[in-house]
């Protein structure tokens, strides 16, 4: 795992105490007298991000109204969350429009925000997707127009592109950073080998390497974030920004009796999620969640709070991206920070015993 207190570690944490009007927990979850919020370094970069970020996939420009999106962003910002993530492909660009409109309307200082977007699928034309120099530059320009921003803090390559030479992609990312369109760049859903290749190309040609990988991470998907990325962090300083802590809602427990109406699995285009939930493996996962629910009750928290705190307990995770469709849901998820100190080694061991899927690095062969 990652070091606990080295200077370059994403485990470096600080607490912010503010007098902002939005309390970090609603009365339902027990509001503390003072607002506390963790910040971590994004990989070995100097960029400080809140350990919880707000994502816009499915929700912004789609599942929720623009008014609800504004309410969620305001709640997040008032509670110390500074990281907001989107992508050119989310709701065919509308998610970026909604996000940009809210930032403009609220008048928040741009320097207080960390805005990230992802480039790969921009349009239907052959030249409007992928990681060519052309699409990275044109795609990011279009994203910035929709966001009404001069720059994003991190631009992510939303998939690896086997049709584009790695050197071309790394040169294009370096170019948009040098042009002031982005501060940093990262990867999403890339393999360790691909990230390492990008780093090697950057070092060979004196270009800018990626600082972060966006990866799926939850109780049922652990290998990449717990085994592969720690090695990359130690070798080249790439951090982890994780998404789907509730496995698209599976870990929330709402699918234990089937597919509720208006849930994500009931939406058009999410048949894959419905199939996953109703599969034999899905039923096994629901049985494990019932056991985890007992641990959550013992700790005085909800199952989603336990699941998010479990992701945060990994010191290699710089930030966990949350998805929310209601204010109550977001406040409940933010409440996971209160659960984090309760996750003792014995509790973690108990959770691992229930899950039965703890991955081991090749370096652990003696243990």
Curated annotation (Swiss-Prot):
It holds the Pfam family Aldo_ket_red. InterPro entries: K_chnl_volt-dep_bsu_KCNAB, K_chnl_volt-dep_bsu_KCNAB-rel, K_chnl_volt-dep_bsu_KCNAB2, NADP_OxRdtase_dom, NADP_OxRdtase_dom_sf. The modification Asymmetric dimethylarginine is found at residue 28. One of its GO terms (biological process) is regulation of protein localization to cell surface. It comes from the Eukaryota. The keyword NADP applies. PANTHER family: HYPERKINETIC, ISOFORM M (PTHR43150), VOLTAGE-GATED POTASSIUM CHANNEL SUBUNIT BETA-2 (PTHR43150:SF1). Belongs to the shaker potassium channel beta subunit family. In contrast to KCNAB1, the shorter N-terminal domain of KCNAB2 cannot mediate closure of delayed rectifier potassium channels by physically obstructing the pore. This is Voltage-gated potassium channel subunit beta-2.
């Amino acid at each position: 795992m990652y070091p606990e207190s080295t200077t370059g570690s994403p485990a470096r944490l600080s607490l912010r105490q503010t007098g902002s009007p939005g309390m970090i927990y609603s009365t339902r979850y027990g509001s503390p007298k003072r607002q506390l919020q963790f910040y971590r370094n994004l990989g070995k970069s100097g960029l400080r991000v809140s350990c919880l970020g707000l994502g816009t996939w499915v929700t912004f420009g789609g599942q929720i109204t623009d008014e609800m999106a504004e309410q969620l962003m305001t709640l997040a910002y008032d509670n110390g969350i500074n990281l907001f993530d989107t992508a050119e492909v989310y709701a065919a660009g509308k998610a970026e429009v909604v996000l940009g409109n809210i930032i403009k309307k609220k008048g928040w200082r741009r320097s207080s925000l960390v805005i990230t977007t992802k480039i790969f699928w921009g349009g239907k034309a052959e030249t409007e997707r992928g990681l060519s120099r052309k699409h990275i530059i044109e795609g990011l320009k279009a994203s910035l127009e929709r966001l009404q921003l001069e720059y994003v803090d991190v631009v992510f390559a939303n998939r690896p592109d086997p049709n584009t030479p790695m050197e071309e992609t790394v040169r294009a990312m370096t170019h948009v950073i040098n042009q002031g369109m982005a501060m940093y760049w990262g990867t999403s859903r890339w393999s360790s080998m691909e990230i390492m290749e990008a780093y090697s190309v950057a070092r060979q040609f004196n270009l800018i390497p990626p600082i972060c990988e966006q990866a799926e991470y939850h109780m049922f998907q652990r290998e990449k974030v717990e085994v592969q990325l720690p090695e990359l962090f130690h070798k080249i300083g790439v951090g982890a920004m994780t998404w789907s802590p509730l496995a698209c809602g599976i870990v929330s427990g709402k699918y234990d009796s089937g597919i509720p109406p208006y849930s994500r699995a009931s939406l058009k285009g999410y048949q894959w999620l419905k199939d996953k939930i109703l599969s034999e493996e899905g039923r096994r996962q629901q049985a494990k969640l019932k056991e985890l629910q007992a641990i959550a009750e013992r700790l005085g928290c909800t199952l989603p709070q336990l699941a998010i705190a479990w992701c945060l307990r990994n010191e290699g995770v710089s930030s966990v991206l949350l998805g929310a469709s209601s204010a109550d849901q977001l406040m409940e998820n933010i409440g996971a920070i209160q659960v984090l100190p309760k996750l003792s080694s014995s509790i973690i061991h108990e959770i691992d015993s229930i899950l039965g899927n703890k991955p081991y690095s090749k370096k652990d062969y003696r243990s």
